[in-house]
Amino acid sequence: MKQGIHPDYHKVVFMDSSTGFKFISGSTANSAETVEWEDGNTYPLIRVEISSDSHPFYTGKQKFTQADGRVDRFNKKYGFADKNAAK
């Protein structure tokens, strides 16, 4: 690799703004805000809006919607009844 062209890769603490959940990970992101981690070291703090602690997919609060196909949407739009549904 060429020297001096790659960003500095270091450990960063990410904090979920909605739940306060924190985790440490490697990143090239920089922040002026710092926080002391459980190991006693100080790391840059990056605030994120959503993480695995608050995302509906990971929390089990995911809502599924019925995705209609193109034909179903056409029939609903123009008022055609499904012949098989009447039987």
Swiss-Prot record:
Q: What top-level branch of life does the organism fall under?
A: Bacteria
Its cellular-component GO annotations read: ribonucleoprotein complex; ribosome
Alphabetically, the GO molecular function entries are:
structural constituent of ribosome
Q: Which Gene3D superfamilies match?
A: Ribosomal protein L31 (4.10.830.30)
Provide this UniProt record's keywords sorted from A to Z.
Answer: Ribonucleoprotein, Ribosomal protein
Q: Which InterPro entries match?
A: Ribosomal_bL28/bL31-like_sf, Ribosomal_bL31, Ribosomal_bL31_B, Ribosomal_bL31_sf
Q: A Gene Ontology biological process annotation?
A: translation
Q: Which sequence ranges are marked TM in the entry?
A: none
What assembly does the database describe for this protein?
Answer: Part of the 50S ribosomal subunit.
* Family assignment from sequence similarity: Belongs to the bacterial ribosomal protein bL31 family. Type B subfamily.
Name recorded for this polypeptide: Large ribosomal subunit protein bL31B
Please tell me the species this chain comes from: Latilactobacillus sakei subsp. sakei (strain 23K) (Lactobacillus sakei subsp. sakei)
Upper lineage ranks?
A: Bacteria, Bacillati, Bacillota, Bacilli, Lactobacillales
Gene for this chain: rpmE2
